[in-house]
Amino acid sequence: MNSMDFMSTLSRHAGEFADRRAVLFRDRRGEQALTYGELHLAALRIGGWLAERVEPGARVLLCYPSGLEFVEVFLGCLAAGVVAVPAPFPDASSLHRERVLAVAADAEPALALTSAPLVEALTAALAGSEPGLEAQAAEYGDPLPRPHVTEPGSLAFLQYTSGSTSDAKGVMVTHRSLVDTLRVGAELLDLREGARFCSWLPMHHDMGLVAMLLLPLHLGGATALMSPTDFLRHPWLWLDLIGRHGAEVSAAPNFAYDLCVRRVTDQQLHDLDLSSWKHVCNGAEPIDAGTLTRFADRFAAAGLKPESLTAGYGMAETTLFISGTAPGHAPVVTTVDPWALERDTLDLAATGRALVGCGRPRALQVLIADPDTGAELPEGRVGEIWVRGPGVAAGYWRKPEETRRTFGGTTATGEGGFLRTGDLGALLEGELYITGRIKDLVIVNGRNLYPHDLERALTWVHAAAENMPSCVFSVAVPREEIVVVQEVRSRALASPGELVEEIRSVLSRKFGVGAANVCLVRPGEIRRTTSGKIRRQVTRQLFASGGLTAHHEALSPTVIAHYRKGHDG
């Protein structure tokens, strides 16, 4: 069997332990599960149906709600040798519809598939797409005698990044890079065959698809799934599912752990058993040291061990994994001088900014480079993170110039083939620290400020804004000025001016920032990606064009002159 082919591994598992549970999905109707034998047969049957309609290598758009049907159809695509293109189902969210239309326009799929009850809705959402697409429901056909024989360098699927909808970028994941990254993930977490996973993450995002579905199947393990909507409504259900199925591995962004701390009641906590959870993986967004402490303290009574918490770093462009905390060791938290950090240096300090280390890179080569010159920087210096090695994707679908710029990094000494991540970070005693995104960096009066630091400081600034998101960026007027867009609960906001002054006071006291421009908006006004990350550049553009619906704005005369002339409010 081809060792660089995921389906060959799945076929072997189906032959060796056909009756072992592979995947389970829980919703309000209960639990449905598939064994390896059932899952493999479903993939071959859907693969047979696909093979009658499209040629190997064709793209197929997959827009499914959470559930087992997506799993079967995605694996059916691999079995038929067609290129799956996972995307969110375009429900009531205009963001999801824009996202799907952008993905469809870029990928030019031959088919668009969804669940039978949703065919009409998806067809309507795709109206006007280029090329014109009508949705279908995949069916079970005559099973393929065996999965399609693939070349290691051929495409397995397109993973679209969570950027702006006008810049949909499909990361080309080959069969080689998929299998390579699954090996890297298993090594990072020190996982054995049969490992048990649990997840609520969406399947159209890399962490949900690769880490929480394909990795357990690659290992002959089991994964228990639920929908993101159910998690957001009832965070306790995720932890309950982990305990009920004895999951060892589950991953989520930082906000999910804070949500559990805030929303899980004492009675729910009493009923939880988290003693099996050995890998509490935190990643996909900036990791807060305080979140790690709060989560470990809150759920210790449920059997959670503090050394089970891990911090990880990865991205779609590496198929997922880059680095992670060593198993059995809590993440390294290092306190650095914030003023030195503004000068791109990590200087240890007794008090200051707490940085969470994302482990030591193992299978991949990681260096810190000057983003302008490509010169490798020494330990403790902040620069752009460059990566080279197994799992790095083949580039962006039909974007040769972006592929060259991003995947063709060459150092000042002539070493080539590096992925330029666009992330800022540093290595210290071998540990990788992430400090922010280059494009999000706020530069004011020569100071480099990281927006997520400022946003985090505003979490508890006022009852009307408690645990509500904020978005910090700078605008040129012509000198850079800071803008804070803060979501608020209007019913708890008696005095907008008072909140503005509290925001300015916090930023002045903690960061030495002068009078910031403040825009107070309703919940949901700050734009996010489909994975929940704040879209700072899009929110900035909306602010600049007057496209945000504001409760109240407190802006400097220069910002008003540049960005509010001709706009209401």
What is the meaning of each model-derived region?
Residues 18-21, 142-160, 166-167, 177, ...:
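Conserved pre-ATP/AMP-binding loop-to-beta segment of ANL
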Residues 356-360, 364-365, 372-380, 384-444, ...:
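Conserved ATP-binding/catalytic segment of the ANL
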Residues 243, 250, 389, 394-395, ...:
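AMP-binding/adenylate-forming catalytic core of the ANL superfamily
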Residues 23-71, 92-96, 100-101, 149, ...:
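Conserved AMP-binding/adenylate-forming core of the ANL superfamily
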Residues 247-251, 263-351, 365, 373-374:
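Gly/Ser/Thr-rich phosphate-binding loop
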Residues 1-34, 38-53, 74, 555-569:
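N-lobe entry segment of adenylate-forming
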Residues 179-196, 203-248, 263-268:
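Conserved AMP-binding/adenylation subdomain of ANL enzymes
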